[in-house]
């Protein structure tokens, strides 16, 4: 079953009355493609001529029903300078709600209550989640020297029918579902010239070519029952090798000229990855976390508003480093924090 057929089945599980035209709109492909794949599902015995799911289709959906989630929250988010020393990224607030609590709430809405949160930097700040949401915290003590491939390896026994979620995602609608069939990795429809990956018409994630720009990676993923086994084996194997210390977990997905799993393509207006101070300001200029003493010092010294401070970049890598470059009124500056 290909990725488009998987999406058709999941849509029909939620509403068997959907027409092919409605399916095309929901999935984001042409009516002709839906008609072709719909007929393929009929030929495969997964839906009837009348559009009903067969026992085989229902069995497939049941076997791959989401049952748990992993939230990656170990990193210290050095690109969030100057506020990354005060609070871990997952606890930044957007519209009065922390990022990680919104994700947990959205998971609960689709029946996912078994949630593992991999923590490292400022791990104590997340402990309230244990009593409030009954999550399990898993500690990655190597967060300062190794990337999130190693965080995911810590919970490799919990990949089966699991969502993998970065803690710095804000989605206007619920990105999770009660029903899944195939594994997927979330990509945005926004073109990104710096990305090496793009989504083709078959929803495959492939290396971009000279004719096509890449798509933005979002980072949320779903791993079904079938794919959990090989992903676990690859994670554990790569985590044992020092050359993968700086690798993202997505490196495990590569096979040949692209990812081994397909894409879930979303509108860029709906899902936001908050990597920087400016990302946070763009989505919620009233966020309490924007009230940084460092930004206030700059604004007062240059007699400008906070919004005129742009293109903030860390000066050098390092967990304790807070000095950064920034631009203001077409001039570049360095903000050096005393004591460094």
Predicted feature residues:
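Conserved core of the sugar-phosphate nucleotidyltransferase
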Residues: 172-247
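A short, conserved structural fragment
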Residues: 42-51
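Key DNA-contact positions within bacterial/archaeal DNA-binding proteins
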Residues: 32
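Conserved alpha/beta core of the MobA/IspD/sugar-nucleotide pyrophosphorylase nucleotidyltransferase superfamily
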Residues: 13-16, 56-69, 216-297
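ATP-binding glycine-rich loop module of kinase domains
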Residues: 325-340
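Conserved beta-loop-beta/alpha segment of the NTase-like Rossmann-fold superfamily
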Residues: 126-196
């Amino acid at each position: 079953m290909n990725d488009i057929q998987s999406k058709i089945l999941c849509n029909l599980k939620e509403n068997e009355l959907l027409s092919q035209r409605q399916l095309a709109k929901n999935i984001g492909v042409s009516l002709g493609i839906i008609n072709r794949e719909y007929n393929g599902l009929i030929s495969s015995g997964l839906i009837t001529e009348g559009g009903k799911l067969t026992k085989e289709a229902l069995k497939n959906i049941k076997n791959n029903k989401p049952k748990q989630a992993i939230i990656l929250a170990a990193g210290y988010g050095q690109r969030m300078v100057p506020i990354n020393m005060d609070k871990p990224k997952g606890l930044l607030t957007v519209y009065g709600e922390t990022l990680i609590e919104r994700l947990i709430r959205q998971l609960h809405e689709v029946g996912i209550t078994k949630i593992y949160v991999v923590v490292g930097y400022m791990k104590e700040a997340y402990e309230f989640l244990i009593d409030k949401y009954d999550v399990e915290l898993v500690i990655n003590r190597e967060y300062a020297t190794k990337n999130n491939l190693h965080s995911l390896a810590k919970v490799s026994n919990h990949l089966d029918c699991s969502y993998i979620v970065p803690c710095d995602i804000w989605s206007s609608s619920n990105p999770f579902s009660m029903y899944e069939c195939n594994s997927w990795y979330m990509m945005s429809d926004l073109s990104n010239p710096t990305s090496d990956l793009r989504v083709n018409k078959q929803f495959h994630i492939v290396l971009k070519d000279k004719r096509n720009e890449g798509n933005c990676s979002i980072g949320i993923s779903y791993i079904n029952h079938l794919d959990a086994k090989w992903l676990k084996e690859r994670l554990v194997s790569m985590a044992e090798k020092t050359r993968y210390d700086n690798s993202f977990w997505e490196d495990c997905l590569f096979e040949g000229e692209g990812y081994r799993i397909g894409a879930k393509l979303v509108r860029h207006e709906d899902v936001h990855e908050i990597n920087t101070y400016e990302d946070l300001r763009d989505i919620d200029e009233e966020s309490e976390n924007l009230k940084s003493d460092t930004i206030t010092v700059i604004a007062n010294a240059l007699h400008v508003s906070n919004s005129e401070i742009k293109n903030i970049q860390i000066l050098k890598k390092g967990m304790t480093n807070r000095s950064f470059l920034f631009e203001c009124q077409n001039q570049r500056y360095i903000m050096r924090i005393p004591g460094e």
